[in-house]
Amino acid sequence: GGTTTDVVMIAKGRPIAAPVGAVVAGHETMVSAVRAHTVGIGGDSRIQYLPLSNDPLSIGPTRATPLVVAAAERPSLITVLTHQLDRNLQRETDGVFLWIRDEIRLRRGLSQAEDEVLAKLGSSPEGMSLHDIATNRQGQNAINRLIGAGVVGISTFTPTDAAHILGVDKRYPIGAAAVGGKLLARQLDRFGNPLAANELEIAASVLQRVRDQVAETILTAAADQDALSEIQLSEVLKAQRSQANLTGRPNRLKIAIGVNGQVALVGAPAASLDPTIDGKWVIDSVIPEHHGVANAFGAAIGDIRLTHQITISAPRRGLYRVHLEEPLNFYDLQRAKQFAEESVDARLRSEMHLAGGVSC
């Protein structure tokens, strides 16, 4: 999707559920639901430049409007970014464009810094560059709070822009993406070297990193089905990365990891974020026809499926306890099973009727 990537295992045409529910950013939700593994990365993931970090590019989990999308609605964006590119000196704030989305949502409780940000943005309906609004950390923190509250919109370089530069996504004109890619490529790492030689190189780097994160999420979901921990999987992935960084001599050890069975990729960025493109992972991917609208179409035609489980325990020989709101004891297993099934049937019929069922 645009903001997240969700991975689920399908068995007999249904997603597998679990009592502990989904896993979001490595944390179990502890709510009985589909066992989905979710990572905050997608076509609209915000790419942030971190000049003092070992890794100067951070991708996700927050989102931003892709430059190609924002430029279609706000023509001044390309003009602003082009002026930044024409300067000989790069700034950390280059390539970030902001506008007011919904000032009404936050009328009270604003700090002075937030008031100042909204006042500046209010003077330009189409939006302004980050540098023109805030040049210090206090102002940038205020902007981040307003973005989080949905008051201020942000556009910056995203994987969607990278896909447009490389020609794997052709939905929008690439002008804004190309300028944004050049601005990002000329930023410096902590050693003073440009991040990339040009916009093509930075775009390829961004998409490769996103594909790797998608692949690792798929592997995590597969490992979870095999009752392997993320720690065990991470050791293999760590060794694979270390080997990939070795240069100057051939590798004697071949490290390959993948998934048994096919992986179906759906969502608008499926083709551009397919993790099997470079052959690094042993994953057999399938991209269905109309994959771009599969999520929306599935939601529109999807059926409602309700499930209930009732536990029957045996505290001692010959005693069978059916665990409902109030546990009931039986001395015959078949009678206990029959009662449990009848209780579940009545509950499901009632809930399906409330959900709109007409023949429950």
Model features per residue range: what roles?
Residues 1-360:
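N-terminally biased helix-coil "hinge/interface" segments that flank
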